[in-house]
UniProtKB/Swiss-Prot annotation:
Residues 652-694 are annotated as: Disordered. It comes from Chlamydia trachomatis serovar D (strain ATCC VR-885 / DSM 19411 / UW-3/Cx). Belongs to the RNR ribonuclease family. RNase R subfamily. It comes from the Bacteria. SMART domains: CSP, RNB. This is Ribonuclease R. The gene is rnr.
Length: 694
């Protein structure tokens, strides 16, 4: 087994180390990454190819073999050595062939199409191709796949893949999502009544006469933040951010707390939310509804007319929101000067928001233009439209105000000497950044190859691409080159926001970390430091799982959506932009569907194959990255969510701006440093505020 060295808990021999961690598998491409249990010792993810999974499944706790002689610049690639424990007790299988009435071959999404498995079927039912089944996870064997595993045991019939209503039960099972709350949790939540708000008034600041209000989407049910704006005697802004005081109701080690700690966050699907807290709290007592008294944590921040922070106060309060405003209503006031009782306040808020945005730009932070959409579903859960998420002035206003509150809270707690969960985002590594710069160069953009840590890098990216048709595509590629934001008790700063201090505080209804931050503000001894380390790891992990579940649900719905197009409009041509061209083929983006596609070289003109063998620089302009092409849907397979395309014709290349002027970064004296079927519709807003990706 080998000896422990320097307290590192891994097994060692001459050639490799065995590192424990959690496996995350790409549901369609088959490869995975292992996130080590000890990030302080292994501050990187380990890549696992599909052929090296050795029977391990998404979510498994594994031991991965990593070459011991790995040098600094080498890719961290490992092989699964052992499955320590299964991450899931059940799998979802889809029947691809029937052997006999009680035995079938099934496709399991987390294993891949190359390895269909046998499954024993429950009696007293007639099965057909496409039936979705709930199966018991097999025991891991060390000799996998040298010996055929025994048939999987069927637990439950879900429905046929042709029925769109089966998609959600499948996602729930695949990602171990619990929708219903235990009786003890529901009972505990229901014991709180409006009278508890009145009873708490004597120990809080009474802000019920303050003009504050919420700004959310028209479909929102949980309102966890309200805003206010007043002025001091010198004319400085006093911005108030008022957050629902969830910690008053969800106390340490209560049934509510234990359940919230399991879930870590709410999960958002098109038309459906799996909340972190029962509706008695999330949609009622903790929701800052208009004209009712609510418990809150209020942060008052004083800013100069130039937008720099000079003072702040944090207190527990009782507020009474005066209005429930929607993004659309606020935009009408800002852009069209629509008359409203609070229009003057909103216009001043918009003014302050623009000042904050300018300061962000001065310190080198840019607002990335990223394509985003919401899937609209009908009563049968069939997709009927893709609705573009438009980032409006109202969205930017709330985003800027929440960023300020999160920054101030992080600064305040950390300067009390209290260990806390930071929201950290490290700069891209050099290798990833070079790949991005090569992609940009291939598209015709020249971005100065300065270190990503320099404050002007993001600004240069914005200046180089601003207003160009390829802007959202290139910005998406830049985001992919960056590391994923996560939670940590070590303050590493936030690269994407260019901030020295940052945490999550503004959404305790839907994020457990925010709830912990609230406790640290007023009862820091209630959070044990050792327990906090476990919390940040669990919340980072659950955040990734939630994102994968949300993405998997959207993928199957998008496949259904495009399948309708190929059935009803098979000859339709779609405009696309080439992202990369390689000997393997071309990848491209279809803005109309916010979708990335790929055409293998075998299905491209023979000239393409010959030219890529000579060198990519020999490709004609109309087949190089950045070129505009026309593609046609060839096939859609619901089982694997595989979408195939055909290149129909090439048109012209979108001309990129080759140079940009470097804007001088102004010094900031305060800590102001461092989201037929109908086609896509415009003008819709996001259904949830602040995705939490920052």
């Amino acid at each position: 087994m080998g000896k422990a060295k320097n307290k590192k808990k891994f097994l060692k021999n001459r050639k490799q180390v065995l590192v424990p961690g959690t496996l995350f598998v790409h549901s369609r491409k088959g490869f995975g990454f292992v996130s080590p249990d000890q990030p302080e010792l292994y501050p990187f993810d380990i890549f696992i190819s599909a052929s090296d999974l050795k029977g391990a499944l998404d979510g498994d706790h594994v031991l991965v073999a990593l070459p011991f002689s790995l040098r600094g610049g080498e890719k961290r690639k490992g092989v699964i050595h052992k499955v320590l424990s299964r991450g899931k007790t059940v799998l979802v299988g889809t029947i691809v062939s029937l052997i006999n009435p009680t035995l079938a071959m099934v496709y399991v999404n987390t294993i891949g199409p190359e390895h269909p498995l046998k499954a024993e079927l429950l009696p007293k039912r007639t099965y057909k191709l496409g039936d979705r089944l709930l199966l018991k996870t097999p025991v891991w064997k060390e000799n996998y796949p040298s010996r055929e595993p025994p048939p999987l045991a069927m637990l439950e019939f879900i429905g046929n893949i042709s029925n769109a209503k089966t998609d959600f039960p499948v996602i729930k099972a695949e990602f171990s999502i619990t929708e219903e709350f235990p009786d003890a949790v529901v009972q505990e939540a229901s014991q709180f009544l409006q009278k508890h708000v009145t009873q708490a008034l004597h120990s809080r600041k009474d802000l019920r006469d303050l003009l504050c209000f919420t700004i959310d989407s028209s479909s929102a049910k949980d309102f966890d933040d309200a805003v206010s704006l007043t002025y001091d005697h010198e004319g400085n802004y006093i911005l108030g951010v008022h957050i629902a005081d969830v910690s008053h109701y969800v106390t340490p080690n209560s049934a509510l707390d234990r359940e919230a700690a399991k879930r870590c966050n709410s999960i958002y699907f098109p038309g459906k939310v799996i909340p972190m807290l029962p509706s008695a709290l999330s949609d009622n007592l903790c929701s800052l509804k208009p004209n009712v008294d609510r418990l809150a944590v209020s942060v008052f921040m004083t800013f100069s007319k130039e937008g720099f922070l000079s003072d702040y106060r944090i207190l527990r309060s009782v507020i009474r929101s005066k209005y429930r405003m929607t993004y659309d209503e606020v935009d009408e006031i800002i852009e069209k000067k629509q008359t409203h009782p609070i229009s003057k306040t909103i216009l001043k808020m918009a003014e302050l928001s623009r000042i904050f945005s300018d300061i962000r730009e001065q310190r080198g932070c840019t607002r990335l233009v990223l394509p985003s959409f919401t899937m609209s579903l009908d009563n049968l859960q069939e997709p009927v439209a893709l609705i573009e998420n438009k980032q409006t002035a109202a969205h930017k206003l709330i985003e800027e105000f929440m960023l300020k509150a999160n920054e101030v809270i992080a600064y305040h707690i950390s300067h009390q000497g209290i260990t806390m969960p930071f929201r950290t985002h490290e700069p891209p590594n050099e290798e990833s950044l070079l790949v991005f710069q090569e992609t940009a160069k291939a598209m015709g953009f020249t971005i100065t190859q300065t270190p990503a840590q320099e404050p002007d890098y993001q600004y240069l990216l914005q200046e180089t691409t601003a207003g160009h048709p390829l802007e959202p595509i290139l910005h998406s590629q830049f985001v992919r080159s960056m590391k994923t934001a996560s939670y940590s008790t070590e303050n590493k700063g936030h690269y994407g926001l260019c901030l020295d201090y940052y945490t999550h505080f503004t959404s305790p209804i839907r994020r457990y970390v925010d709830l912990i931050v609230h406790r640290l503000l007023f009862h820091p001894l209630s959070v044990e430091e050792e327990h906090l380390e476990q919390i940040v790891r669990a919340c980072s992990s659950q955040e990734r799982i939630a994102a994968k579940a949300e993405g998997a649900f959207v993928n199957i719905k998008k496949a259904r959506f495009l399948k309708k197009f190929i059935e009803e409009q098979p000859a339709t041509l779609y405009k696309a932009f080439i992202i990369t061209a390689s000997p393997e083929g071309i990848s491209f983006v279809l803005p109309e569907f916010c979708h990335e596609g790929f055409i293998p070289a075998a299905k491209l003109p023979q000239a393409y194959v010959l030219q890529t063998k000579i060198g990519l620089e020999e490709l004609p302009e109309h087949l190089r990255p950045g070129a505009v092409i026309s593609v046609q849907l060839a096939s859609v397979t619901l089982l694997t969510q595989s979408i195939e395309w055909t290149l129909v014709e090439a048109t012209t290349k979108a001309k990129a701006k080759r140079t940009s002027k470097k804007k001088k970064t102004e010094s900031v004296t305060t800590k102001e440093k461092k989201k037929s079927p109908a086609k896509k519709k415009k003008g819709a807003t996001k259904t949830k505020k602040g995705s939490g990706k920052n």
